[in-house]
Amino acid sequence: METGVIFGFLETIKNLSKRFDTNKFVFCWDSKKSKRREIYPEYKANRNVDKTETEHIEDNIAFKQFHDLRVPILPKLGFKNIFIQTGYESDDLIAILVRKRLKDAIVVTNDDDLLQLLDCCEIYNPRTKQLITCETFESKYGVHPSMWPHIKSLAGCTSDNIKGIEGVGIVKALIFVKGKLPSGKIRDRIFNNCAILKRNTPLIKLPLEGTVLPIIQEDEKFYIDNFIDVFEKYNFRSFLKKESFEQWCKLFRME
């Protein structure tokens, strides 16, 4: 049984709990069905085009482990705020939660689409180990985070296969929204392609229209026996070592 993804995910939870001194986690997952693809059929159509058979097999193995995390592993451990919504992405759920429900939230992601939320949360990038705030964003880009959807709509998003305006990348888009792009071909091209902006903005701006606000449950409790059961079932012996398990117990205030 492949368990590498599960182990890595749980280890990340432990490390985040230590770094931010919390046992409060909210997990948001992508739906397999995509309303964005209904709006724009080319959305993410590039994701599987050039993958080898081996890569497809690896993806399927990882998908099964992520499914097992969502049901049954995380609930068994005691986590209750685990959300998925048909047709919507984790980004949509995160966005509506931090805008309407969660205060002082730290969003853990390496997806720069979520930078638009920095006016109401902080973002921790697990790859760079960097905590991004509204202030650090404004210092780097010279605009408020609320402008990010407009910038991305102009530039497009290669990873999501959203085509922007030809010749306009993030740098040119930033110059344009600051009102500093000089007259010329690029500026004319932007004004002549308003239809692209009209198409892209609803795809990029978060949350997607129609996202329903999840209900946060506050009554989470974590029990030693449940953690032992999960760690033994998946043979996570390093988590069961005395020092490591004592850390788990302390971090999650287990009973």
Describe each model-derived feature in a short phrase.
Residues N15, R19-W29, K44-D50, F79-I82, ...:
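Non-catalytic nucleic-acid-binding/docking modules located in mid-to-C-terminal regions
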